Amino acid sequence: MAAIGVHLGCTSACVAVYKDGRAGVVANDAGDRVTPAVVAYSENEEIVGLAAKQSRIRNISNTVMKVKQILGRSSNDPQAQKYITESKCLVIEKNGKLRYEIDTGEETRFVNPEDVVRLIFSKMKETAHSVLGSDANDVVITVPFDFGEKQKNALGEAARAAGFNVLRLIHEPSAALLAYGIGQDSPNGKSNILVFKLGGTSLSLSVMEVNSGIYRVLSTNTDDNIGGAHFTETLAQYLASEFQRSFKHDVKGNARAMMKLMNSAEVAKHSLSTLGSANCFLDSLYEGQDFDCNVSRARFELLCSPLFNKCIEAIRGLLDQSGFTADDINKVVLCGGSSRIPKLQQLIKDLFPAVELLNSIPPDEVIPIGAAIEAGILIGKENLLVEDSLMIECSARDILVKGVDESGASRFTVLFPSGTPLPARRQHTLQAPGSISSVCLELYESDGKNSAKEETKFAQVVLQDLDKKENGLRDILAVLTMKRDGSLHVTCTDQETGKCEAISIEVAS
């Protein structure tokens, strides 16, 4: 039996396969183990991956990047609004949904984010099939801990449209622990693990408890203001300043020149993880002027020191939030391509001097490898080396029901607080006037991170054709069951008549 694990990040995607008891990442047709999560549209074709990324300088308005940031979001979502402002590919609202406006000259197309993700998933499936054959379509897909129900559903919809059979969605930190087999080396012991993920656009931190081979998420936090792109941007700004110093031309306002500098800065950043210096040469950067600049690792570290400090302060903040000290952490797992940066690794080691830093698996491969292992567990574990891992996921957001108070104002009741271990079951009694013939239970979610949090409706259950009563109230019992993958089953029952309605919000099948 064979299965697939896929990790879709904001800037890149990676696919791993489980076969013959082992999991490993598969290189794409260009020989790269990580594929840019970029889709470019031309008059006759849709281009995915490195070729799309390389062509964006001349086709920027029809090139979609960072689609994960807008997937499953509405136009009034603050993160979607930020994305729309920054996107070089025009995003509009059409028929109540966000669409990319693609103009290739012959026609104008309106493409939804799910279709973009479908193309990326199709590329991942094609890559997996190169080693497994076309019959292997079972997949486990990773999601950030703070993904909401609508985002999970949109991701699952795109995966199924690409031809995948989605076995489960699992949280990224859980996949990272699976990749290292944490819990198998000391199945009867208890340990606390910090998962440090520095991706392309954000820093995600999680504290996980492993006890007798069982995983539990204790606390988590994401900072969208620190990511690999911010390190690249910092270096690109330095290169622009050096160009201005040498040639008296300020190119910081020139989009084409800055895109070239960003490309060069990204290559240099990668090189500086293994080399002491990197050369940035750009042919005809601006007005026919070539640019050649050597950047040392020491210079890069100095430029990015504020970003390094933010990463370390974020770790300290999460430890405080968890009620832990650095001494309470037993291992640190590194994920995300930018966690390769040597200076960052040294700062983390300094914070946890007695702790094992796990980075033997390439950081941008560890999450899809864990997903492939989970897929192997699900399709049959008789040959799997990591046989007994059991993840206990927890709810990423507050799940609430909406009611009204005595004054008629909206009142929300939290049934599943963020961090509730899954699976879990809750009951809620909704009282409604007996004179009405239908009752609606509305379900909301909230990130619960601050006092100004906003509740977002994601589902409702309507109990109709109820017998009216002249006096009194009727009691409606709502039973909500959330499974380990975050899918939710809701049953509403009229306690007097037994009339019942139910819905299921599936996120992984």
Curated annotation (Swiss-Prot):
InterPro entries: ATPase_NBD, Heat_shock_70_CS, HSP70_peptide-bd_sf, Hsp_70_fam, HSPA14_NBD. The keyword Cell wall biogenesis/degradation does not apply. It comes from the Eukaryota. GO terms for molecular function: ATP binding; ATP-dependent protein folding chaperone. Keywords: ATP-binding, Chaperone, Cytoplasm, Nucleotide-binding. SUPFAM superfamilies: Actin-like ATPase domain (SSF53067), Heat shock protein 70kD (HSP70), peptide-binding domain (SSF100920). It is found in: Cytoplasm, Cytosol. GO terms for cellular component: cytosol; ribosome. Gene3D superfamilies: 3.30.30.30, 3.30.420.40, Actin, Chain A, domain 4 (3.90.640.10), Substrate Binding Domain Of DNAk, Chain A, domain 1 (2.60.34.10). Pfam families: HSP70. Component of ribosome-associated complex (RAC), a heterodimer composed of Hsp70/DnaK-type chaperone HSPA14 and Hsp40/DnaJ-type chaperone DNAJC2. Belongs to the heat shock protein 70 family. Component of the ribosome-associated complex (RAC), a complex involved in folding or maintaining nascent polypeptides in a folding-competent state. In the RAC complex, binds to the nascent polypeptide chain, while DNAJC2 stimulates its ATPase activity. This is Heat shock 70 kDa protein 14. The gene is HSPA14.
